[in-house]
Amino acid sequence: MNILKISKQTLRNNIKIIREYIGNAKMCFPVKANAYGHGIEDIVENTHDLVDFFAVANSLEAFRVTAVAKNPVLVFGVIYYEYIEKMISENIRVSIQDYEYIEKLEQIAKELDKKVYAHININTGMNRMGVDYNDACRTIQRAYESDWLILEGVYSHLACADNRDHPTNIKQKNRFDSIVKFTKGLSQDIICHLSNSYGFLGQKGICYDMVRPGILSYGFLPEFYVDRVIREIKPIARLLSKVVKIITLQEGEGVGYSLIYRGFEGEQLAVIPIGYGDGFPRELGDRGFVNINDVMYPMAGRMSMDGLTVSLGINEYDVKVGDTVELISAIPRNRNSAFSIAKQINTIEYDIMSTLNDRIIRKII
């Protein structure tokens, strides 16, 4: 059995540290992509009393949140009409991505005789989603004056927050500042929010009314940040499995598809029942590391859909069937941490964690 063990204490401590850091700003906790691979229901159930909002990518994720918590839920993505009635009935917050969408929302709200909570997404420079910056004030005014919309928030997203010195950060902040000024002229109660994890850590004066610390809440820090308080944030999860078989190679034998790994006579290999079919990165095959009984062992041969092998050498530490295998460590400096794995295969921690699928059991401890 493969288990992602999640520390409730570490998770809650991370959020408390963030809340202290952001002061009076509200916290919107992103739990999209199955809470970055950690499991939406478990994460929401164990944090709902610490955060103001949750945020997700789509309607189906929003329904998973509302099933276990009463916090407001903001959907970042485009809303599909087959779900809009249920979303409105559950007071799920809708993102307005263009001016024309307001009229469509109003029509549905009238039919249901229920107002829609909305946040307007403004494109200040990422050029992915959102109302064009030049059309922002008109759209905000229109939504604010609507009889069927409750304009709860206005937001944008930083394109280069992971590079705190990038000039686009200042450009986007300046644009958003002008949007905030216009919005607050309509109502001081409208929540303005721009910052993700890297945003509020890397830029000053950018918390506004609310921040959206996703990856930071799960314990992953930007390399550039060395603040003593924030450095107390830790990864919340470890990925564990078991040794299910020990194999001894004969002279000239290899292991795995195409037998790309050729061992030596008498070499022992441990078989671990996890593979790319579980969302574990295939690129790690033949170059990743796992921890068994506090000893690091290299992966050997290509990873398959349902399993991988590691070289025990002559097995001087007597690894046995049933021994626990740590595939992802919660200690960032370890060779098998999500941070180290991401560096090794040229990706990011988000990718490593969010692709772990439901063949892996999540367990809060």
From Swiss-Prot:
Record-level GO BP terms: D-alanine biosynthetic process
Annotated coiled-coil segments of the chain: none
Taxonomy, superkingdom: Bacteria
Residues where substrate binds: R128, M305
An example molecular function term from Gene Ontology annotations: alanine racemase activity
Magnesium recorded as keyword: no
Catalytic reactions on record: L-alanine = D-alanine
UniProt keyword list: Isomerase, Pyridoxal phosphate
Active-site residues from the entry: K32, Y257
Pathway note: Amino-acid biosynthesis; D-alanine biosynthesis; D-alanine from L-alanine: step 1/1
Top-rank EC class of the record's enzyme: isomerase
GO CC terms, sorted: cytosol
NCBIfam families noted in UniProt: alr
Record family assignment: Belongs to the alanine racemase family.
Described function: Catalyzes the interconversion of L-alanine and D-alanine. May also act on other amino acids.
Name this polypeptide is given: Alanine racemase
Native organism: Francisella tularensis subsp. holarctica (strain OSU18)
